[in-house]
């Protein structure tokens, strides 16, 4: 299909490594504004039988998500402790898969909570720290491997 001048188009970047599991019953997605497009893509691949809880970190950005009656959206404050407290208050069914993407200071305590407090197995958690407050892309890239290793060590992985 050809695009004509004046047509609206959407451009997508490369996809991530996570694919929605076929047997997923419940998805917990925790995301800041930067990660909402990834959450939207994940919701689009969610099986019809699955439910989702989206914890949307409060921001001034309002990215449209494909919401249905199977999706619940909860807003969390921007601070990492507030995000974890919001998730602690959720009743998560068995076979929950977690998709946590956003700023590094949010991702680290969420991993700790999901692995150590909730007992979610590593293979049911997908985390990605997209950015690190106060660092540019090169600065974040320079320390990201060490950051990921320290998160693994913290949660016994």
Question: Where in the sequence are the language-model features?
Answer:
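Extended, composition-driven regions rather than compact fold-specific motifs
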Residues: 1-157
């Amino acid at each position: 299909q050809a695009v004509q001048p004046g047509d609206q188009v959407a451009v997508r970047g490369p996809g991530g490594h996570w694919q929605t599991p076929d047997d997923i019953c419940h998805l917990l997605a925790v995301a800041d504004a930067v990660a909402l497009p990834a959450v939207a893509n994940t919701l689009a691949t969610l099986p019809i039988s699955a439910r989702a809880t989206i914890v949307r970190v409060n921001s001034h950005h309002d990215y449209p998500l494909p919401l249905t009656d199977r999706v619940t959206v909860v807003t969390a404050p921007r601070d990492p402790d507030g995000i974890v407290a919001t998730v602690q208050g959720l009743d998560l069914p068995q076979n929950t898969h977690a998709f946590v993407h956003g700023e590094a200071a949010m991702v680290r305590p969420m991993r700790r909570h999901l692995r150590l407090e909730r007992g979610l197995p590593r293979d049911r958690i997908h985390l990605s720290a997209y950015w690190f407050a106060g660092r540019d892309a090169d600065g974040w890239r320079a320390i990201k491997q060490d950051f990921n290793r320290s998160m693994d060590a913290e949660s016994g992985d």
